Amino acid sequence: MLETNLHFISAIVIFLAAIVPIYLTLKLKNNIRKLTLILTIFILTHAVYHIVGFYGLTLLGEGVFEPLSVAVLIFFGIIYSGFAKPKNMGVKNSMVVVWNPGTLLLLMNSITTLLLLVALGIFVWLAVRSRNIRSFQFQISIFIIIWILGEITGILQVSGIIVFTALQGDIGLEIHVVSMVFFGMMLWLRFYYSERIGKNMIEGLDTTLR
């Protein structure tokens, strides 16, 4: 029951957070529009993951939408790092054909974990490069690092690799909800200050609405 409620809360928080990048994607006319579009796709894809999780469709959520959202997140990290400094990076796609749903879920969890580790490396690097805790680059990197750690913890807990004997419930999902609340607050506060005092939401990039 707790896990179902956490999926529902996460979906609501994510949809609220998605309003800002969706609005910016529709209004912006410069290259930053690509960045906000990719961020929007990540948010909505992950929201769908929580919706199917809320309805108990574990195989569809963890086997399709979770790794898909992580792949989009990696793409976002590559594009964002390209705005800061051009860098040649590549992500190899692999296709696995299996027939057993349980085996499929296990393999997709393994693939998701690998993708999460790739994303973790990208955003740790971005956070270290930022060196300014007030910058968008640092704040979104911290959100994603916390989110990734929550996802990895959840996968390891479900797989039985780690056990929290003193704690109840899905610890990874609880960390995930906290990170999404932080993410939503960060987006809305930056949007508020952008509208009120004309400050760019993303430092070094023109986010002026036309």
What are these regions (language model features)?
Residues F15-K27, G77-G82, L116-S130, M185-Y192:
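Alpha-helical transmembrane segments in multipass membrane proteins, preferentially the mid-helix core
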Residues L44-T45, F75-F76, L105-G121, S141-G150:
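Alpha-helical transmembrane segments of multi-pass integral membrane proteins
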Residues K29, R33, L39, R134-F136, ...:
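Sequence/structural signature of long amphipathic alpha-helices
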Residues G82-L107:
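Surface-exposed beta-loop interaction hotspot
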Residues T25-T36, T58-L59, K87-V91, A127-Q137:
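Membrane-interface helix-boundary motifs at transmembrane edges
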Residues G61-P86, I122, I146-R210:
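C-terminal transmembrane-bundle signature of multipass membrane proteins
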Residues M1-A18, V98-V118:
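Hydrophobic transmembrane alpha-helical segments in integral membrane proteins
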Residues F8-P21, K34-L57, E66, V70, ...:
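Hydrophobic alpha-helical transmembrane segments of multi-pass membrane proteins
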